[in-house]
Amino acid sequence: MKILILGAGRVGSSLASTLSRQEYEVSIVDLNKDKLLRLQEDYDLATEIGHASHPITLEKAGADKETIVLAVTNSDECNIASCQIAKSKFNVKKTICRLSDSAYLESLEAFGKDNIDIAIGPENEVTEHLVDLIKHPGAEQIESFANGSLKAVSVKARKDGMLVNRELKSIKSDMPDTDTFVPAIYRKGKPLIPDGKTIIKENDEIYFLAAESDIDSIVQEMRLQDTSSSRIMIIGGGKIGSALAKGLEDDYKIKIIDPDKDRCEVLSRELNRTIVLKGAGSDEELLKSENIENIDIFCALTNDDETNIMSAFLAKKLGAKKTIIIVNNYTYINILPKNFVDIALSPQRLTVSMVLQHLAKGDVPQEVIFKMQSGAEAIEGIIHKNKFTEEFFDKPISELPLPDGCVIAAVIRADEVYMHSKNLLLKPNDKIIVFILGKTDKEKIENLFLTD
């Protein structure tokens, strides 16, 4: 499959890295020669220097009817124009367009019928994730599956957790009426597929599946539950900061800080119950005057990673109970000290997940990357009768020939969810959620979801 990536920024480079390691013929376009040279040195791909929306550039990059175009530059307008030209002039197979401005997302028909096949709005996705994390304190990552009926949750085990230093199967006796399944644990950065006799240890990174209503009680098994939050301070009144404030202000006490006077005036008009303050998140006197020591959750959501990191450090030093930040450079994620930054959310990871979902072979409603560097992800797909699935029907799940590092975490059949289902026999058209840990043959999993 031919993939043409437009834009070699963080998202484009991450896509190039991920897709070039799979069975794709990847080309990438950017105006920055140095970025393209680095990518060409590191990965098996082709590069083209030029403007992403220029017809000659697209032609030189190989755009044709077999090409899928991923327009992920930092300019919505460039992405839109690129998709229009790629479709109308080169009749490309599919266009996927990254759009930051929700106004564009709501007006796709204005750009011509069929010019943009799939539009993705990472800012909306980031906001939804932030809301989930604020509503479920203690969880470090929450992803939705099965149309929202199941959540995959990451939580770090602490020594005060009820299940720590006990066997995993003890969760059933602790919570007999709660249905959950733990498909993966990361211990000291390395993945393991647990069983009932696995001892939960402090600092284990545990992934579990459960209904949203059960998340908080399961988190409490792994760590002492954080106290409920009512006071939230947001640094950055951009698209994400303002959307988060708007989504939470009816249920929480919100303060939002932005250095731009004009932006503050806009926020004051758009928000009803949020206190809007002009200033910087790194202004110690401002934070003290706004009683930072009483803030339950401090969210640094500007477009500048360093500002977000330093603001979170300062807020924690001054007494904020919990810090959540946005980090655009994913390499920062693994080096941030947890005593200052509780949760770092990566728009880059979310965008790559959204794109991969639409590139997946077969019938795949959802695909989520949990860890970009280690390759951990989960795929929700519908298993069909085809030449690859002959050995997968009329056999217990425990006997299926899955690649190493893969586990079927749940089966959804006629709106019924089955977990702990080692003896369940798969049927055609079952929806399954597969966790893939580390480097494994992902194509073998995707082949299960092919329709013929």
Question: For each of these PLM feature ranges, what is it?
Answer:
Residues 1-452:
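Cytosolic regulatory regions of ion transport systems
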